[in-house]
């Protein structure tokens, strides 16, 4: 199970997150718990691990300082993001990272730098996402909207290429096929599986709340319950000539090799 939220660091939010993790661990002791709660301090990350969390996804978005400064508020720090990733590794998490592909101003050299950062960081799992424009973000100027529409197929293909290159660089890591790929093509995630991804994530968020979590426009899978999403995911894997591994935690082989030799 993946639990994702914004960066909430006040005491009540921390207690809320801890209570959820403890409840899941108590009721479903065999379930793997992945968290994506943004940058958090090391003591809280330790508490979450002790409560029962196994994995933590913290995307770098871009390892290039120039782009990172452009995409984030002034009080955000690339150095702090990297420190948090190191903290997660030191606490024994399966550590996930990732980037956004196709950003305005991003070059091929920038994407190569990201891949080298992933390799050198020795991460266990990855969430790579294509840039999908959202009208309520600072990047969504009329000029950028037109730019994105003209280059959407290029962004999609570059995402598949990065997945394939990452699979070659890190053959035993877990790589998610991002839901956002289905914005570009109905079989976008299936194409990602063929390119080298090996993880699909069905949404179990109640449909009544999915419209409140629109990270990008044209987001698929806003209707339907968890059971329907699960069946859809199985069909996608089968159409990519893969057999889904159901009922297992799906621990990254890279993590097992890294921690057990």
Give residue spans per PLM region.
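Core AdoMet radical
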Residues: 1-15, 19-84, 94-101, 124-127
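Conserved, mostly hydrophobic/aromatic
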Residues: 3, 58, 88, 118, ...
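Generic structural signal for well-ordered alpha-helices
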Residues: 17-22, 45, 82-85, 115, ...
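Surface-exposed amphipathic alpha-helices with a cationic face
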Residues: 18-28, 49, 85-90, 163-170, ...
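Catalytic cores of alpha/beta
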Residues: 41-50, 103-119, 183-195
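Aromatic-anchored, glycine/proline-accented short structural segments
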Residues: 84-135
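Auxiliary Fe-S-binding modules of radical SAM enzymes
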Residues: 119-261
């Amino acid at each position: 199970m993946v639990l994702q939220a914004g960066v909430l660091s006040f005491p009540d939010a921390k207690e809320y997150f801890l209570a959820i993790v403890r409840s899941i661990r108590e009721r479903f002791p065999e379930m793997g718990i992945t968290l994506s709660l943004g940058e958090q301090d090391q003591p809280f990350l330790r508490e979450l691990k002790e409560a029962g969390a196994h994995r933590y996804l913290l995307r770098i978005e871009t390892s290039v300082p120039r782009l990172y400064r452009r995409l984030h508020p002034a009080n955000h720090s690339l150095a702090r993001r990297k420190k948090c990733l190191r903290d997660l590794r030191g606490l024994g998490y399966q550590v996930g990272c990732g980037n956004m592909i196709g950003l305005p101003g991003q070059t091929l050299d920038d994407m190569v730098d990201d891949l080298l950062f992933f390799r050198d960081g020795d991460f266990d799992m990855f969430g790579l996402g294509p840039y999908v424009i959202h009208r309520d973000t600072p990047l969504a100027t009329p000029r950028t909207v037109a730019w994105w529409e003209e280059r959407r197929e290029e962004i999609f293909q570059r995402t598949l290429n990065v997945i394939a290159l990452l699979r070659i660089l890190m053959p035993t890591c877990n790589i998610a096929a991002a839901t956002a790929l289905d914005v570009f093509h109905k079989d976008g995630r299936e194409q990602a599986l063929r390119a080298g991804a090996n993880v699909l994530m069905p949404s179990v968020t109640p449909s009544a709340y999915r419209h409140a979590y629109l990270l990008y426009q044209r987001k698929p899978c806003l209707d339907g319950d968890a059971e329907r999403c699960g069946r859809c995911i199985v069909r996608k894997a089968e159409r990519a000539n893969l057999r889904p591994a159901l009922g297992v935690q799906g621990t990254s082989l890279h993590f097992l090799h890294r921690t057990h030799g």
